[in-house]
Curated annotation (Swiss-Prot):
Organism: Burkholderia mallei (strain ATCC 23344)
Signal peptide: none
Job of this protein: Associates with the EF-Tu.GDP complex and induces the exchange of GDP to GTP. It remains bound to the aminoacyl-tRNA.EF-Tu.GTP complex up to the GTP hydrolysis stage on the ribosome.
GO CC entries: cytoplasm
UniProt family annotation: Belongs to the EF-Ts family.
PANTHER family given in the database record: ELONGATION FACTOR TS, ELONGATION FACTOR TS, MITOCHONDRIAL
Keywords: Cytoplasm, Elongation factor, Protein biosynthesis
Gene Ontology MF annotations: translation elongation factor activity
Protein's cellular compartments: Cytoplasm
Protein name: Elongation factor Ts
Region (Involved in Mg(2+) ion dislocation from EF-Tu): 80-83
InterPro entries per record: EF-Ts_dimer_sf (IPR036402), Transl_elong_EFTs/EF1B (IPR001816), Transl_elong_EFTs/EF1B_dimer (IPR014039), Transl_elong_Ts_CS (IPR018101), UBA-like_sf (IPR009060)
Top-level lineage group: Bacteria
Length: 293
C-alpha cells in the first residue's frame, strides 16, 4: 500500500475543499491514486449533500450588496447557528448577494444556474454542503435597481434591510434602514398594508369590542379605532422614529427634505417551522441508521 503523505492530503484538499480526514481516507482507499481519490471524494461529498438536502434549514444569515445602480438582500439558510458563523458560509452569502445585484436573476432557480468560479452557483452550494456537512439553501432574495440612493442595514447578520430613498443626507437612509430592522413595519404607508392582515386585525377587534357590552354603534366605532391604530403601528411612515419618538418617520423625512420609495426586510428563518426532535428520538434514529449501514 502506498504511503499517504501530508503533502498528498493537502493537494487533494486544495482540489476538492473537503475536510482533511476525508481526504486522507479517500487517498487510503485509492491506494495513493490522486485521480481516483478525487473521484471517490466527489462521489462521497455528493452523497453527503444528497442526505443533507432533506433536513430543515431554519438558521442562517442575511447578506447585502449595493453597487452603482442596484442593491440586493439574500437570505442563505443552514441547519445550525454554528454553521451560520462559518467563514466559508458567510463568504458564499456575500458572493450570492453581489451576483443578485449585478446579474439580475429572475428567481432562485435562475440564480442557482449562474456561473461562479468555473461552476454554477448551485454546484458551489453543493460543494459547501459536502464540506460543512449541513444542508444549505438559498431561500430568497430581493433586488432594487434605481437611480435613487440605496441604504442597507444588517443586525447581527440575522436581520437585513434595504431602503430606496431620495435626499442629500446619507445618514437619513441609514437611519431609516436601522428603524425598519428595529420596528419591523409591514408596509411603507397605511394604504399598502395587506388586506388579509387588516381583516385579521378587524376580526380580533370585533371580538374584543363585542365583549364590552356596549351598543352596536359604539362597538363599530371601537373596531374602526382599533384598526386605524393598527395601521399606524405597522406602516413605516406613521411609526414614531426609533431615534426620536417625538416625531414620526414621515415627519423626520420631511424635515430632512427626503423621501422613501420602498424598503425590504428579511429576518432569518421567518416563517420556517424548525424541527423539534427530542433527545431519545434522536438517539433512536441514529441507532436505526447505524444498523442499516
Amino acid at each position: 500500500m502506498a504511503a499517504i503523505t501530508a503533502s498528498m492530503v493537502a493537494e487533494l484538499r486544495a482540489k476538492t475543499d473537503a475536510p482533511m480526514m476525508e481526504c486522507k481516507k479517500a487517498l487510503t482507499e485509492a491506494d495513493g491514486d490522486m485521480a481516483k481519490a478525487e473521484e471517490l471524494l466527489r462521489v462521497k461529498l455528493g452523497n453527503k449533500a444528497s442526505k443533507a438536502a432533506s433536513r430543515v434549514t431554519a438558521e442562517g444569515v442575511v447578506a447585502s450588496f449595493v453597487g452603482a445602480n442596484a442593491g440586493a438582500l439574500v437570505e442563505l439558510n443552514c441547519e445550525t447557528d454554528f454553521v451560520a458563523k462559518n467563514d466559508d458560509f458567510n463568504a458564499f452569502a456575500k458572493t450570492v448577494a453581489e451576483l443578485v445585484a449585478t446579474q439580475n436573476p429572475a428567481d432562485v432557480a435562475a440564480l442557482s444556474a449562474l456561473p461562479l468560479d468555473g461552476k454554477t452557483v448551485d454546484e458551489v452550494r453543493l460543494a459547501l454542503v459536502g464540506k460543512i456537512g449541513e444542508n444549505i439553501s438559498i431561500r430568497r432574495f430581493v433586488r432594487f435597481e434605481t437611480s435613487n440612493k440605496l441604504a442597507t442595514y444588517l443586525h447581527g447578520s440575522r436581520i437585513g434591510v434595504i431602503v430606496e430613498y431620495t435626499g442629500a443626507q446619507e445618514q437619513v437612509g441609514k437611519d431609516v434602514a436601522m428603524h425598519v430592522a428595529a420596528m419591523k413595519p409591514v408596509s411603507l404607508s397605511a394604504d399598502e398594508v395587506p388586506a388579509d392582515l387588516i381583516e385579521k386585525e378587524r376580526r380580533v377587534a370585533e371580538q374584543k369590542a363585542a365583549e364590552s357590552g356596549k351598543p352596536a354603534e359604539i362597538v363599530a366605532k371601537m373596531v374602526d379605532g382599533s384598526v386605524q391604530k393598527f395601521l399606524k403601528e405597522v406602516s413605516l411612515l406613521n411609526q414614531p422614529f426609533v431615534k426620536n419618538d417625538k416625531q414620526t418617520i414621515e415627519q423626520m423625512l420631511k424635515a430632512a427634505d427626503a423621501a422613501v420609495q420602498k424598503f425590504a426586510l428579511f429576518v432569518v428563518g421567518e416563517g420556517i417551522e424548525k424541527r423539534q426532535d427530542d433527545f431519545a428520538a434522536e438517539v433512536a434514529a441514529q441507532v436505526a441508521a447505524a444498523k442499516q449501514q
